Amino acid sequence: MQIFVKTLTGKTITLEVESSDTIDNVKQKIQDKEGIPPDQQRLIFAGKQLEDGRTLSDYNIQKESTLHLVLRLRGGIIEPSLKALASKFNCDKMICRKCYARLPPRATNCRKRKCGHTNQLRPKKKLK
C-alpha cells in the first residue's frame, strides 16, 4: 500500500509499505529516500507519536494515510517546574538602590558597607 509522509518544510514523500511493517521499517525507508537518520525522526499520526516497535496496523494506518515527520530536538527543553524554580532563584531578588547589590528576596538592609547598609531596596525587575 502507499502512504505519504509530510515534512515540516511541506515536502511530501511517498512510500510503498505493508500494514505489517514496523515503524522502524518506515523510518528506514525515509532514511533511504531523504538521508535523515532514524534516531532523529519522529513520526506523528492522528496526533500521536508512533513508537518504533509497533506496526502500521497497530495505529490503524491504511492506504494513502499521511504521517507527519518531525525531527527530534538536539537539546532538551526546560520542564515547566524547573523553569519556575530557575526563575525564582534568578529573578526573585531585592536590589539596593545605592550600590545595586543583589540581595535575597526577604532582605531589609543591604549587606554592603559602601552604601552604609542602607534600607533603600527595590524588587528586581521581572523579565518580559
UniProtKB/Swiss-Prot annotation:
Alphabetized Gene3D superfamilies for the sequence: 4.10.1060.50, Phosphatidylinositol 3-kinase Catalytic Subunit, Chain A, domain 1
Domain of life the protein comes from: Eukaryota
Pfam families to which the protein is assigned, alphabetical: Ribosomal_L40e, ubiquitin
Biological process (GO), any one: translation
Keywords, comma-separated and alphabetical: Cytoplasm, Isopeptide bond, Nucleus, Ribonucleoprotein, Ribosomal protein, Ubl conjugation
Any one GO cellular component localisation term in the record: ribosome
Cross-link (Glycyl lysine isopeptide (Gly-Lys) (interchain with K-? in acceptor proteins)): 76
Single GO MF annotation: ubiquitin protein ligase binding
Record InterPro entries: Ribosomal_eL40_dom, Ribosomal_eL40_sf, Ubiquitin-like_dom, Ubiquitin-like_domsf, Ubiquitin_CS, Ubiquitin_dom, Ubiquitin_ubiquitin-like
Keyword Ubl conjugation attached: yes
Ubiquitin-like domain boundaries: 14-89
Crosslinked positions (Glycyl lysine isopeptide (Lys-Gly) (interchain with G-Cter in ubiquitin)): 6, 11, 27, 29, 33, 48, 63
Keyword Cytoplasm included in the entry's annotation: yes
Family: In the N-terminal section; belongs to the ubiquitin family.
Additional record remark: Ubiquitin is encoded by 3 different genes. Crp-79 is synthesized as a polyprotein with one copy of ubiquitin fused to ribosomal protein eL40. Crp-6/ubi-3 is a polyprotein with one copy of ubiquitin fused to ribosomal protein eS31. Ubi is a polyprotein containing 4 exact head to tail repeats of ubiquitin.
Name of the featured protein: Ubiquitin-ribosomal protein eL40 fusion protein
Organism of origin: Neurospora crassa (strain ATCC 24698 / 74-OR23-1A / CBS 708.71 / DSM 1257 / FGSC 987)
Protein's gene: crp-79
